[in-house]
């Protein structure tokens, strides 16, 4: 037999299960005629356990009119059996729980004679059991508690909303789904349309926060004390370094003051040297300076007449021999140069030899030259040599 069930066979199986459910739901229960476990056919017991009895089981050899009348009265659907199988009343049905469809033949119900042992496969029995349970549970309404739809609020629900507990409907096995609240109008089990699922809150939302650390990773008090001790020692070392830098700063300040004092002394000595030896500021010889200040031609340009003027007078004079000559120029008289006082310069140079020359031999040589000097130029040469030796 093919292990895969076709779509038509599945539909017939579902309709058969629905008819079985309607039959047991509509039929009255009689305790005296209830089936016991001993009277149930082996192999069909899992399907019929927990169901009411079914009355007037039709045998395959029953008449067509009796089956039709009982099937219409009890809600059981009649099934047409092929003529080839109708004559064999004692033969076993290969699939006892499947609905058999065909054209013509004897009409019989889906229930088999208890005396006939079924030879159907276990897969067919299980499929029949599953289809029957689903059809029965589909039309059995259970009291359901509707889940309240809470409105979303920013920041999470309040204290009152958090205190409420949401009761969920338990599902025992293959129970009815809580998503549909209306009973289906189709007896074939087909879903006409799907209802829109409303947003349901399955559980109470929890506020999101930082999870506390596990107690296993908590530090002991001794570890904390050791860490604090290490940090304290580190800070003490830094403080010692800062204090050491403070003493160094004081030393730098003292050295800086010494440098300033030395610089002031050098500046004073340089000022003294400038006063004693002014010299030529430009370093240009005197002859060049006189040449630059000599007479030169001056050109006057611009509008207007420039009257001619001559520095010489047109008067002629007679010399000693009565010769006409121009006005004689007076002879230049050289002015005697004043004698400069060299005594003060010698005293200043003697003081410089004493302060600036440390070598006794050089000091003695400068004193001898100073005693022999009689002109200003000689004194200036001695002064320059003293300054050079000091540098």
Swiss-Prot record:
<feature type="modified residue" description="Phosphoserine">
    <location>
        <position position="257"/>
    </location>
</feature>
<dbReference type="InterPro" id="IPR004897">
    <property type="entry name" value="P/V_Pprotein_paramyxoviral"/>
</dbReference>
<feature type="modified residue" description="Phosphothreonine">
    <location>
        <position position="16"/>
    </location>
</feature>
<feature type="modified residue" description="Phosphoserine">
    <location>
        <position position="301"/>
    </location>
</feature>
<keyword id="KW-0693">Viral RNA replication</keyword>
<feature type="modified residue" description="Phosphothreonine">
    <location>
        <position position="250"/>
    </location>
</feature>
<feature type="modified residue" description="Phosphoserine">
    <location>
        <position position="374"/>
    </location>
</feature>
<feature type="modified residue" description="Phosphothreonine">
    <location>
        <position position="282"/>
    </location>
</feature>
<feature type="region of interest" description="Interaction with the nucleoprotein">
    <location>
        <begin position="343"/>
        <end position="391"/>
    </location>
</feature>
<comment type="function">
    <text>Essential cofactor of the RNA polymerase L that plays a central role in the transcription and replication by forming the polymerase complex with RNA polymerase L and recruiting L to the genomic N-RNA template for RNA synthesis. Also plays a central role in the encapsidation of nascent RNA chains by forming the encapsidation complex with the nucleocapsid protein N (N-P complex). Acts as a chaperone for newly synthesized free N protein, so-called N0, allowing encapsidation of nascent RNA chains during replication.</text>
</comment>
<feature type="coiled-coil region">
    <location>
        <begin position="218"/>
        <end position="245"/>
    </location>
</feature>
<feature type="modified residue" description="Phosphoserine">
    <location>
        <position position="294"/>
    </location>
</feature>
<feature type="region of interest" description="Disordered">
    <location>
        <begin position="148"/>
        <end position="185"/>
    </location>
</feature>
<feature type="modified residue" description="Phosphothreonine">
    <location>
        <position position="375"/>
    </location>
</feature>
<feature type="modified residue" description="Phosphothreonine">
    <location>
        <position position="150"/>
    </location>
</feature>
<feature type="region of interest" description="Disordered">
    <location>
        <begin position="54"/>
        <end position="97"/>
    </location>
</feature>
<feature type="modified residue" description="Phosphoserine">
    <location>
        <position position="69"/>
    </location>
</feature>
<comment type="similarity">
    <text>Belongs to the rubulavirus/avulavirus P protein family.</text>
</comment>
<protein>
    <recommendedName>
        <fullName>Phosphoprotein</fullName>
    </recommendedName>
</protein>
<comment type="subunit">
    <text>Homotetramer. Interacts (via multimerization domain) with polymerase L; this interaction forms the polymerase L-P complex. Interacts (via N-terminus) with N0 (via Ncore); this interaction allows P to chaperon N0 to avoid N polymerization before encapsidation. Interacts (via C-terminus) with N-RNA template; this interaction positions the polymerase on the template for both transcription and replication. Interacts with host RPS6KB1 kinase; this interaction may play a role in the viral replication and transcription.</text>
</comment>
<keyword id="KW-0175">Coiled coil</keyword>
<feature type="modified residue" description="Phosphoserine">
    <location>
        <position position="292"/>
    </location>
</feature>
<feature type="modified residue" description="Phosphoserine">
    <location>
        <position position="188"/>
    </location>
</feature>
<feature type="modified residue" description="Phosphothreonine">
    <location>
        <position position="298"/>
    </location>
</feature>
<feature type="compositionally biased region" description="Polar residues">
    <location>
        <begin position="54"/>
        <end position="65"/>
    </location>
</feature>
<feature type="modified residue" description="Phosphothreonine">
    <location>
        <position position="165"/>
    </location>
</feature>
<feature type="modified residue" description="Phosphothreonine">
    <location>
        <position position="258"/>
    </location>
</feature>
<feature type="modified residue" description="Phosphothreonine">
    <location>
        <position position="91"/>
    </location>
</feature>
<keyword id="KW-0597">Phosphoprotein</keyword>
<feature type="modified residue" description="Phosphothreonine">
    <location>
        <position position="10"/>
    </location>
</feature>
<dbReference type="Pfam" id="PF03210">
    <property type="entry name" value="Paramyx_P_V_C"/>
</dbReference>
<feature type="region of interest" description="Multimerization">
    <location>
        <begin position="216"/>
        <end position="279"/>
    </location>
</feature>
């Amino acid at each position: 037999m093919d292990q895969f069930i076709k779509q038509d066979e599945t539909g017939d199986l579902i309709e058969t299960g629905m008819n079985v459910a309607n039959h047991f739901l509509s039929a009255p229960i009689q305790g005296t005629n209830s089936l016991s476990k001993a009277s149930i056919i082996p192999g069909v017991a899992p399907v019929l356990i927990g169901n009411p009895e079914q009355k007037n089981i039709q045998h395959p050899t029953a008449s067509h009119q009796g089956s039709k009348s009982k099937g219409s009265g009890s809600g059981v659907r009649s099934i047409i059996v092929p003529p080839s199988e109708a004559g064999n009343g004692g033969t076993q049905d290969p699939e006892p729980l499947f609905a058999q469809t065909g054209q013509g033949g004897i009409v019989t119900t889906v229930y088999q004679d208890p005396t006939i042992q079924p030879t159907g496969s276990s897969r067919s029995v299980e499929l029949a059991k599953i289809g029957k349970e689903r059809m029965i549970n589909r039309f059995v309404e259970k009291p359901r508690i509707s889940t309240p739809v809470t409105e979303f609020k920013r920041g999470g629900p309040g204290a009152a909303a958090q205190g409420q507990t949401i009761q969920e409907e338990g599902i025992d096995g293959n129970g009815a789904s809580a998503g549909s609240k209306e009973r289906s109008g189709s007896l074939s089990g087909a879903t006409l349309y799907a209802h829109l699922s409303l947003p349901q809150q399955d559980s109470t939302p929890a506020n999101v926060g930082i999870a506390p650390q596990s107690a296993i990773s908590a530090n002991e008090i001794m570890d904390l004390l050791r860490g604090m001790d290490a940090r304290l020692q580190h800070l003490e070392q830094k403080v010692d370094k800062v204090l050491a830098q403070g003493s160094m700063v004081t030393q730098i300040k003292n050295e800086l003051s010494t440098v300033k004092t030395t610089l002031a002394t050098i500046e004073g000595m340089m000022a003294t040297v400038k006063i004693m030896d002014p010299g030529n500021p430009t370093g240009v010889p005197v002859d060049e300076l006189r040449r630059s200040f000599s007479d030169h031609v001056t050109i006057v340009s611009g509008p207007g007449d420039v009257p001619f003027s001559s520095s010489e007078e047109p008067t002629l004079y007679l010399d000693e021999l009565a010769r006409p000559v121009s006005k004689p120029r007076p002879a230049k008289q050289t002015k005697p140069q004043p004698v400069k006082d060299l005594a003060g310069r010698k005293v200043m140079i003697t003081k410089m030899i004493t302060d600036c020359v440390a070598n006794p031999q050089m000091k003695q040589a400068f004193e001898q030259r100073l005693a022999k000097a009689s002109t200003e130029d000689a004194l200036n040469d001695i002064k320059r040599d003293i300054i050079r030796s000091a540098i």
